[in-house]
Regions:
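A short glycine-rich, His/Asp/Glu-containing loop-to-beta-strand
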Residues: 46-66
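Short beta-strand His + acidic residue motifs that chelate non-heme Fe in jelly-roll/DSBH
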Residues: 71-72, 90-91, 114-117, 126, ...
């Protein structure tokens, strides 16, 4: 039965672990040089996805990941996956108080259940439907997983993607009119059309809730740059009343998560990616410190600060620690910005008395430094 398949897949992978029995170089060569391969899908999941065995009821795939971070999602299939190469941060969630707005749009409360570090040889069951909501943040390049999965499990769709803390959407719904409208709005953004904001406002006034949300989600970044976001949100909120209330926290969380995921593509060091994964997926300072302590020896805060030093970037445009920018209102030569910014970060991470290096800094400038860090990915870790 379908209910038994995840356990069957786990036992098969654990009985003959891919990490010990699959030669990745040979698999790559054979796939490139021999045409006698199973039928390949058009799926965009994986970078790439290789189907290495196909059966009418199930198939086996090798998923490569270069800079991929999966959305929080559920599955319309069941089975299991095993880490062949690399490691990942794996997070599980539950979606409580769920309410269907349409067949493709749900509201509720997404709660983090568990976060674990998956390493080579670790195996995880996949249960179709809403009882298995998860995400993966891959640390090494490449990371490779072997998946044994059914073709599709009837009655377990749609395969929702979750937008914390409150929304679930069907990413493959066939609303092609909304798709084309979003693409056309992208053209107007690219060409700096002066009508962009006014057209969005008119659309928000006429579109239903679901289409209005997707339009806002697509336009949010440009509307903020134009200074028109507050007006657009007010129009959406006025039109939809209490139904709109859970939307804003999810839209703001999209901005935070997208910023962290975007940094992942330019960061290859596994330790730095590990920090990004924790900042993206965990919800408290204590949880981050516990996960760092689990993987690395030494003081977790010292490890985090060491990574912060390595992640500091100075250029003509400014000084950055991850996505925290040195404040414009502090007048300081460029070569002195990074030492001050890092000293402030170290102080706000550890708490306690002000260190000697910061005693000469004015309260106003110290507040600006803290505000810059609080508006970035570092916020969760500050004391």
């Amino acid at each position: 039965s379908l209910a038994a398949f995840p356990e069957i897949a786990v036992k098969a992978l654990e009985a003959k672990p891919a990490s010990r029995h699959v030669d990745l170089e040979k698999l790559t060569r054979d796939f490139l040089l021999h045409d006698d391969q199973p039928h390949q899908s058009s799926s965009g999941f994986g970078q790439p996805e290789l189907i290495v065995y196909d059966n009418p009821k199930f198939y086996i795939q090798a998923l490569f990941w270069l800079d991929g971070t999966t959305d929080i999602h559920q599955h319309e299939f069941s089975g299991a996956f095993q880490v062949l190469e690399g490691s990942s941060i794996h997070s599980r969630y539950v979606f409580e108080n769920a309410e269907s707005i349409t067949a493709h749009f749900r509201m509720g409360d997404l709660k983090l259940q568990e976060t674990q570090l998956l390493e080579r040889g670790d195996t995880v069951p996949i249960v179709s439907g809403r009882s298995c909501i998860h995400s993966l943040f891959h640390l090494e390049t490449p990371s490779v997983t072997i998946v044994i999965r059914t073709q599709s499990d009837p009655g377990t769709g749609p395969q929702f993607t979750y937008l914390p803390p409150h929304l679930a959407i069907d990413p493959v719904q066939g609303d092609f009119l909304t798709l084309r409208r979003k693409q056309l709005l992208d053209v107007l953004e690219h060409t700096a059309s002066p009508e962009y904001a006014s057209l969005i406002l008119k659309m928000i006034g006429t579109l239903d809730f679901e289409r209005g949300f997707f339009t806002l989600q697509n336009a949010m970044g440009h509307l903020r740059n134009l200074g028109a976001w507050d007006q657009a949100w007010a129009a959406f909120s006025k039109k939809h009343g209490a139904l709109a209330k859970p939307v804003l926290p999810s839209l703001l969380e999209i901005i935070r998560r997208d910023a962290l995921v975007a940094m992942r593509s330019s960061i290859e060091d596994p330790d730095h990616r590990f920090l990004l994964a924790l900042l993206l997926n965990l919800e408290s300072r204590e949880a981050v410190l516990a996960m760092v302590a689990r993987r690395y020896s030494g003081d977790p805060l010292e490890n985090i600060f060491h990574w912060a030093v390595e992640l500091t970037h100075c250029s003509e445009s400014g000084t950055w620690i991850l996505n925290a920018e040195f404040p414009d209102d502090i007048e300081l030569p460029p070569d002195e910005q990074a030492p001050l910014f890092l000293t402030a970060l170290n102080h706000f991470l550890a708490g306690g008395k002000t260190p000697p290096e910061l005693k000469s800094v004015s309260k106003k400038n110290l507040s600006s430094l803290r505000a810059a860090l609080e508006s970035s990915a570092w916020k969760m870790l500050l004391k």
